[in-house]
């Protein structure tokens, strides 16, 4: 069996924040809340301009409390 697709899904960064671009937007796969670094996260007092990879290790989705590892990378903005 080919394992090329096992453990991966389109948009996954596999919890490796080092693979993310500074301007990467990510979406919670539980509630679809979007983290946009241009906006930051006012709930967690994350300043605009903060990349997803620079979020604190304890950061969670402000909408559903999902773990950061549950986020998927979104494609480029149109």
From Swiss-Prot:
Locate the Rubredoxin-like domain: which residues?
A: 23-74
- Signal sequence span is none
Q: Which cofactor does it need?
A: Fe(3+)
Chain residues that bind Fe cation = 28, 31, 61, 64
Instruction: Supply the alphabetized keyword list.
Output: Electron transport, Iron, Metal-binding, Plasmid, Transport
The yes or no answer to whether the keyword Magnesium is present is: no
Q: Name one GO biological process term.
A: alkane catabolic process
Any one Pfam family match given in the protein's UniProt record, by short name: Rubredoxin
Per the entry, the cofactor note is: Binds 1 Fe(3+) ion per subunit.
Q: Which GO terms label this protein's molecular function in UniProt? A: electron transfer activity; iron ion binding
**Highest taxon of source:** Bacteria
Concerning Gene3D superfamilies, the annotation shows: 2.20.28.10
According to the record, the segments passing through the membrane are none
Under the heading InterPro entries, the entry gives: Rubredoxin-like_dom, Rubredoxin_dom, Rubredoxin_ET, Rubredoxin_Fe_BS
Main function:
Rubredoxin is a small nonheme, iron protein lacking acid-labile sulfide. Its single Fe, chelated to 4 Cys, functions as an electron acceptor and may also stabilize the conformation of the molecule. Could be involved in hydrogenase-linked redox processes.
Write out the similarity annotation: Belongs to the rubredoxin family.
Specify the protein name: Rubredoxin
Q: Which organism is it from?
A: Cupriavidus necator (strain ATCC 17699 / DSM 428 / KCTC 22496 / NCIMB 10442 / H16 / Stanier 337) (Ralstonia eutropha)
